[in-house]
């Protein structure tokens, strides 16, 4: 018997976040086995690329058969894929899933993507060269310290996020106010109010009990990728002339960048392994830093998949879920 989610005036979406190698794919596979009325959207800046399967730990063919993921294999490695691209693609998929009567589950570890889904990409007034010129002239007369103090008076909240020496952002914040009559804070709050009315977001995050446990898993996974043909996968990419101009975000992905250095002759094989594992650990540290500051999260056991799934189902049952 399939489990459905009750309809609401504001539709549900679910976030399943977690650091690299925390078991997110395993959890979402088990969720799908529960016959919930859900569909999966990947929130991963590396999984969007085709022909990059091993180094990204992309879900296997069998796993995708159980739990198909949207936004996987949608770009060639030579293509750029920005936060804005993800936001628009994800909103499109979210709305399609909701219209089909299912609940979107967004799973991944690219925390900036998740943040953008919560805050949105709000439109700011266009640049006015006349206003900018006037502001720059004023700054030359009264000094940047006084320009920063002026911003503090106009928009104290935004001024706290801008360094007093960041002249470009000071000018932009003042320009927005002079051209629109609204501060950046006011414009953002108006947009967030509109965003909050679109979806009810339930947020879950996998958190390992010990970081060392996760680091050991990372090391084991990196060696497993090497045995599975990671070097050959990157060699195929390396053979493409269009991937050598240094601008592709795909080749900057953790693991790929280090293997690329090895194939370029810049590091030895053992150095590549060390740097790959180290870079992955730094990525995980960054992800955990994001998560520890993340508001309104239901924390899940990161050491046991079944416990995590049961805890998640328990929370969902309180909000929306019936058999």
Curated annotation (Swiss-Prot):
Task: Tell me the keywords, alphabetical order.
Answer: ATP-binding, Magnesium, Nucleotide-binding, Transferase, tRNA processing
Record Gene3D superfamilies? 1.10.20.140, P-loop containing nucleotide triphosphate hydrolases
Kindly list the GO molecular function terms attached to this UniProt entry: ATP binding; tRNA dimethylallyltransferase activity
* A GO BP annotation: tRNA modification
The positions annotated as site (Interaction with substrate tRNA) read: 110, 132
Residues that coordinate or bind ATP: 18-25
Q: What is its EC number?
A: 2.5.1.75
Q: Which reaction does it catalyse?
A: adenosine(37) in tRNA + dimethylallyl diphosphate = N(6)-dimethylallyladenosine(37) in tRNA + diphosphate
Renumbered residue ranges of the record's region Interaction with substrate tRNA: 44-47
Family in the record? Belongs to the IPP transferase family.
- Which HAMAP family has this protein been placed in? IPP_trans
NCBIfam families in alphabetical order:
miaA
- Could you tell me what this protein does? Catalyzes the transfer of a dimethylallyl group onto the adenine at position 37 in tRNAs that read codons beginning with uridine, leading to the formation of N6-(dimethylallyl)adenosine (i(6)A).
In Swiss-Prot or TrEMBL terms, this protein is called tRNA dimethylallyltransferase
Organism from which the protein derives: Blochmanniella floridana
């Amino acid at each position: 018997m399939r489990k459905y989610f009750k309809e609401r005036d504001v539709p549900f979406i679910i976030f399943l976040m977690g650091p690299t190698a925390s078991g997110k794919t395993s959890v979402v596979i088990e969720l799908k086995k529960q016959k919930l009325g859900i569909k999966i959207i990947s929130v991963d800046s590396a999984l969007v690329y085709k022909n990059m399967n091993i180094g990204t730990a992309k879900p296997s063919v069998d796993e995708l058969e159980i739990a198909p993921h949207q936004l996987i294999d949608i770009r060639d490695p030579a293509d750029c894929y920005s936060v804005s691209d993800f936001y628009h693609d994800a909103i499109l998929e979210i709305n399609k899933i909701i219209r089909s009567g299912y609940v979107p589950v967004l799973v991944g570890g690219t925390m900036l993507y998740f943040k953008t889904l919560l805050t949105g990409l709000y439109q700011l007034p266009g640049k006015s060269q006349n206003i900018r010129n006037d502001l720059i002239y004023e700054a030359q007369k009264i000094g940047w310290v006084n320009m920063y103090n002026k911003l503090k008076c106009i928009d104290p909240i935004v001024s706290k996020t801008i360094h007093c020496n960041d002249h470009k952002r000071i000018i932009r914040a003042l320009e927005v106010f002079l051209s629109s009559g609204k501060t950046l804070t006011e414009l953002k709050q108006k947009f967030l109010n509109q965003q909050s009315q679109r979806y009810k977001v339930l947020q879950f995050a996998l958190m390992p009990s010990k970081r060392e446990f996760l680091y050991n898993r990372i090391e084991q996974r990196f060696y497993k990728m090497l045995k599975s043909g990671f070097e050959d996968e990157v060699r195929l990419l390396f053979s493409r002339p269009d991937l050598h101009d240094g601008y592709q975000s795909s080749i900057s992905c953790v693991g790929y960048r280090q293997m690329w250095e090895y194939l370029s002759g810049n590091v030895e094989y053992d150095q590549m392994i060390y740097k790959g594992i180290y870079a992955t650990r730094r990525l995980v540290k960054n992800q955990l830093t994001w998560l520890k500051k993340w508001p309104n999260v239901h924390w899940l056991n990161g050491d046991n998949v079944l416990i995590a799934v049961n805890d998640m189902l328990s929370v969902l049952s309180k909000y929306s879920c019936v058999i």
